[in-house]
Amino acid sequence: MPHYRRILLKLSGEALLGDGQYGIAANTLDRIADELAEINAMGVEVAVVIGGGNIFRGAGLAASGMDRVTADHMGMLATVMNALAIQDALERRSVFCRVMSAIKINQVCEDYIRRRAVRHLEKGRVVIFAAGTGNPFFTTDSAASLRAVEVGAELLLKGTKVDGVYSSDPVRDPEAKRYQQLTYDEVLSKRLEVMDATAIVLCRDQAMRIMVFDITSPGTMVAAARGEPVGTVVDPGLPSAQEESS
């Protein structure tokens, strides 16, 4: 039996890279689609927010002089491309799926309307939210927090390249400690790289539970949807974080 009724998965665009430096790796896309299809078959209602960093990173060009709003709009379009790729992969697995965009591009996908999104989820369709919040200066992490709250998700799953939240970069620091559980305020005060501060504050204010897990580890996403203890949990929780050795 699934542990959660409705979840939202936040994927960075880089999660689709695989071993490449740019674009979408077919084998990585297929693995993620397989796991999403398995979760959907369990009866869990699944929403997805996808980034676009595998195709375009606006921050770099903005730092080089491009107008920030223009750069962010280009990044939004990159997320639409990724969303369409995931939709196609799911439909090839006979999973009903809808892409909903925060910016109008309705010859390609639906406009985001909250009530319609909830109805799609209730009908068992996977819903992929594209184009972030539709506003510049907001990250796709903030979009994930916002959409999770709006559609009433019980869990926000944040897929990363490591198996949880660490006290420092575990690649560079062999002494880094992995947290099993954190509160929202601990994430903010310790400046831990879970999500940006705007996203964390929204989750805190709405008591949206976050689970950070390793998206590159096959089966971990499904295990998280079953309620198994994977990665790091961020919630109102305990007043002090629990750590374990990396």
From Swiss-Prot:
UMP binds at residues 52, 72, 133-140. One of its GO terms (biological process) is 'de novo' CTP biosynthetic process. It catalyses: UMP + ATP = UDP + ADP. Keywords: ATP-binding, Cytoplasm, Kinase, Nucleotide-binding, Pyrimidine biosynthesis, Transferase. One of its GO terms (cellular component) is cytosol. Pathway: Pyrimidine metabolism; CTP biosynthesis via de novo pathway; UDP from UMP (UMPK route): step 1/1. The keyword Kinase applies. It is found in: Cytoplasm. Inhibited by UTP. Its EC number is 2.7.4.22. It is an enzyme of class 2 (transferase). It holds the Pfam family AA_kinase. InterPro entries: AceGlu_kinase-like_sf (IPR036393), Asp/Glu/Uridylate_kinase (IPR001048), Uridylate_kinase (IPR011817), Uridylate_kinase_bac (IPR015963). It comes from the Bacteria. One of its GO terms (molecular function) is ATP binding. Belongs to the UMP kinase family. Homohexamer. HAMAP family: PyrH_B. Catalyzes the reversible phosphorylation of UMP to UDP. This is Uridylate kinase. It comes from Halorhodospira halophila (strain DSM 244 / SL1).
